[in-house]
Amino acid sequence: MNANHYQTKRDRSYFEWGDKMQIIRKGKGEIAMTESEFVDFFSVTWRKLNYRLQLLLKTYPLQSEERAAGEVEVFVNGHLRGYALLYPLTIIIALSYQLDGMEAHLFRKHICQELQHPTPMVEQIFIYGSGSIN
């Protein structure tokens, strides 16, 4: 996706916290989050988030698709006020290593568990026959 692509929450997935501090993936598209979703998800201040995010984007040589996953429209009182950048999963993971809170630690743990235990593939087996089962 390019930076001029506009998305809604229906077009993407994002992370939220469940009741017992479990991570819930919401949505059905590619994972991408806005800065305000980072602040809520990682429970950090805007100042800390902006500092760490700018440091990450300036310091590390990232490809353009690793930097942004599009934009989402921002509405205030029903009026379009602007656009917020969406950051892809690569930035979310890298940012979690720049933050030191419990939420970032649990997110890193979740990502490592997902990588170690991939979702099992379901194999379909078709049996061709020319008669009844009896």
Q: In which residue ranges do the predicted regions lie?
A:
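N-terminal entry module detector
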Residues: 31, 44-45, 57-62, 66
